[in-house]
Design a protein with these regions (language model features):
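Alpha-helix-loop-beta-strand connector modules within alpha/beta enzyme cores
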Residues: 11-12, 17, 69-97, 135-156, ...
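Conserved, mostly hydrophobic/aromatic
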Residues: 17, 50, 58, 118, ...
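Conserved anion-binding
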Residues: 21-24, 105, 109-186
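Catalytic cores of alpha/beta
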Residues: 97, 102-115, 173-174, 206-211, ...
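Glycine-rich phosphate-binding active-site loops on the catalytic face of alpha/beta enzymes
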Residues: 113-131, 182-194, 219-222, 232-256
């Protein structure tokens, strides 16, 4: 386990819960009538429910900003900073941020809000719904350090959603190479889209080649599968399973979140 990962999450297998912000100003699905206060109110409700359920950490993301872009609008990043700032006094667990699909904006948002970790696609070469995808880990990680946040833990998603890798190497080889070349603090394995599970066989294959690097399930972990996932992986990021009816775009269901954490604690032996 890497030092930064341990410092942020402790020695266990963390459950990182998503706070999916509503569509931000400028995005096609933004609710202009409810405006910024609506974004804050909805995020506060989800954050409160997740923390009451006992999640280990939360991550703020802009999954509702569809169609997605590789370079986030400045207003989107600023709005995310505003919402997180309004909630900062209520956040009682480590928190992270992710501005889809923009590593530079994600780093800037983390620096502005004091986030402990970030998630993004930092490496690889993909064909995606958004077009050709060629992130630049070297540029992003250097930007983190220029912002004075060398302490920021980096969670690298090595199997991008909404995309197909153009790299002919196997997923374990891509993950192993990313750890060697681009110094992540953890590696994430995803399903095809938000809410769809990563294959347990993929998690196991990546973990087998990275015994000293945290490997987390990034998508699609459900109540029925969290035990099996945490048997293989070093933690998980979960969003859809904690929502009303298990639907990604619904608010958090306090009862579903509490039951998920009960199952996670049992799987972790506590």
């Amino acid at each position: 386990m890497t030092e930064k990962f341990r410092k942020v999450f402790g020695g266990g297998k963390p459950v990182i819960a998503m706070v999916h912000l509503g569509a931000l100003p400028g995005a096609p699905l933004h609710d202009a009538e409810r405006g910024l206060e609506g974004l804050v109110d909805d995020a506060r409700q989800d954050l409160t429910a997740l923390q009451a359920a006992g999640v280990d950490a939360v991550m703020f993301g802009n999954e509702n900003d569809r169609p997605y872009e590789f370079t986030a609008d400045t207003a989107s990043t600023a709005t995310m900073a505003y919402v997180i700032g309004r909630l900062r006094a209520l956040i009682a667990v480590p928190f992270g941020v992710n501005v889809l699909w923009d590593p530079m904006s994600t780093m800037a948002l983390a620096a502005a809000t004091g986030a402990a970790f970030v998630r993004e696609i930092f490496t690889g070469h993909y064909a995606s719904d958004m077009g050709p995808w060629t992130p630049d880990a070297g540029r992003a990680v250097r930007y983190r350090n220029r912002l004075g946040r060398s302490d920021l833990a980096l969670l690298y998603n090595v199997s991008a959603e909404f995309a197909w890798s153009l790299d002919r190497r196997s997923l374990p080889d891509r993950a192993r190479s990313a750890v060697f070349s681009s110094i992540p603090d953890a590696v994430l394995v995803s399903g095809a889209i938000t809410g769809e599970p990563a294959e347990l066989s993929d998690l196991l294959a990546v973990k087998n080649v990275l015994p000293d690097t945290p490997v987390l399930a990034n998508t699609g972990v459900r109540h029925e599968t969290v035990g099996d996932v945490l048997h293989v992986a070093d933690g998980c990021i979960v969003g859809s399973a904690l929502k009303v009816d298990g639907h990604t775009w619904n608010p958090v269901d306090p009862a579903r979140a509490a039951e998920f954490m009960r199952l996670a604690r049992a799987a972790r032996g506590g």
